[in-house]
Amino acid sequence: MSLLTEVETPIRNEWGCRCNDSSDPLVVAASIIGILHLILWILDRLFFKCNYRFFKHGLKRGASTEGVPESMREEYRKEQQSAVDTDDSHFVSIELE
């Protein structure tokens, strides 16, 4: 149970834990919500870059380059890469080999 719902009280020269309301539905719901919030926060921090790109650009796929000359494909690829790497006025320079 959550540390916030536990109360330590002196019992017979010892420190014990008295959790009278641990079966209260509100306490159980709050604990579950707290655990889910913590898990989602950790996942957000771990996958921040992926989440940011997903919400900013959606699930858009690049246009088909069938029948397009290689020089135009390369220019399009650079434009798409620069659009993805732009993060709130922070520009990332990537050299393609």
Curated annotation (Swiss-Prot):
<dbReference type="GO" id="GO:0005216">
    <property type="term" value="F:monoatomic ion channel activity"/>
</dbReference>
<comment type="subunit">
    <text>Homotetramer; composed of two disulfide-linked dimers held together by non-covalent interactions. May interact with matrix protein 1.</text>
</comment>
<keyword id="KW-1015">Disulfide bond</keyword>
<keyword id="KW-0406">Ion transport</keyword>
<feature type="glycosylation site" description="N-linked (GlcNAc...) asparagine; by host">
    <location>
        <position position="20"/>
    </location>
</feature>
<dbReference type="GO" id="GO:0044694">
    <property type="term" value="P:symbiont genome entry into host cell via pore formation in plasma membrane"/>
</dbReference>
<feature type="modified residue" description="Phosphoserine; by host">
    <location>
        <position position="82"/>
    </location>
</feature>
<keyword id="KW-0449">Lipoprotein</keyword>
<keyword id="KW-0735">Signal-anchor</keyword>
<keyword id="KW-1083">Inhibition of host autophagy by virus</keyword>
<keyword id="KW-0472">Membrane</keyword>
<comment type="similarity">
    <text>Belongs to the influenza viruses matrix protein M2 family.</text>
</comment>
<feature type="site" description="Essential for channel activity, possibly by being protonated during channel activation, and by forming the channel gate and the selective filter">
    <location>
        <position position="37"/>
    </location>
</feature>
<feature type="topological domain" description="Intravirion">
    <location>
        <begin position="44"/>
        <end position="97"/>
    </location>
</feature>
<keyword id="KW-1133">Transmembrane helix</keyword>
<feature type="region of interest" description="Disordered">
    <location>
        <begin position="62"/>
        <end position="89"/>
    </location>
</feature>
<feature type="site" description="Seems to be involved in pH gating">
    <location>
        <position position="41"/>
    </location>
</feature>
<dbReference type="GO" id="GO:0016020">
    <property type="term" value="C:membrane"/>
</dbReference>
<dbReference type="GO" id="GO:0020002">
    <property type="term" value="C:host cell plasma membrane"/>
</dbReference>
<keyword id="KW-0813">Transport</keyword>
<feature type="lipid moiety-binding region" description="S-palmitoyl cysteine; by host">
    <location>
        <position position="50"/>
    </location>
</feature>
<keyword id="KW-0946">Virion</keyword>
<feature type="transmembrane region" description="Helical; Signal-anchor for type III membrane protein">
    <location>
        <begin position="23"/>
        <end position="43"/>
    </location>
</feature>
<keyword id="KW-0325">Glycoprotein</keyword>
<dbReference type="Pfam" id="PF00599">
    <property type="entry name" value="Flu_M2"/>
</dbReference>
<feature type="modified residue" description="Phosphoserine; by host">
    <location>
        <position position="93"/>
    </location>
</feature>
<dbReference type="GO" id="GO:0055036">
    <property type="term" value="C:virion membrane"/>
</dbReference>
<keyword id="KW-0375">Hydrogen ion transport</keyword>
<dbReference type="GO" id="GO:0140321">
    <property type="term" value="P:symbiont-mediated suppression of host autophagy"/>
</dbReference>
<keyword id="KW-0945">Host-virus interaction</keyword>
<keyword id="KW-1182">Viral ion channel</keyword>
<keyword id="KW-0564">Palmitate</keyword>
<protein>
    <recommendedName>
        <fullName>Matrix protein 2</fullName>
    </recommendedName>
</protein>
<feature type="compositionally biased region" description="Basic and acidic residues">
    <location>
        <begin position="71"/>
        <end position="80"/>
    </location>
</feature>
<comment type="function">
    <text>Forms a proton-selective ion channel that is necessary for the efficient release of the viral genome during virus entry. After attaching to the cell surface, the virion enters the cell by endocytosis. Acidification of the endosome triggers M2 ion channel activity.</text>
</comment>
<dbReference type="InterPro" id="IPR002089">
    <property type="entry name" value="Flu_M2"/>
</dbReference>
<feature type="modified residue" description="Phosphoserine; by host">
    <location>
        <position position="64"/>
    </location>
</feature>
<dbReference type="GO" id="GO:0015078">
    <property type="term" value="F:proton transmembrane transporter activity"/>
</dbReference>
<keyword id="KW-1032">Host cell membrane</keyword>
<keyword id="KW-0812">Transmembrane</keyword>
<keyword id="KW-0407">Ion channel</keyword>
<dbReference type="GO" id="GO:0051259">
    <property type="term" value="P:protein complex oligomerization"/>
</dbReference>
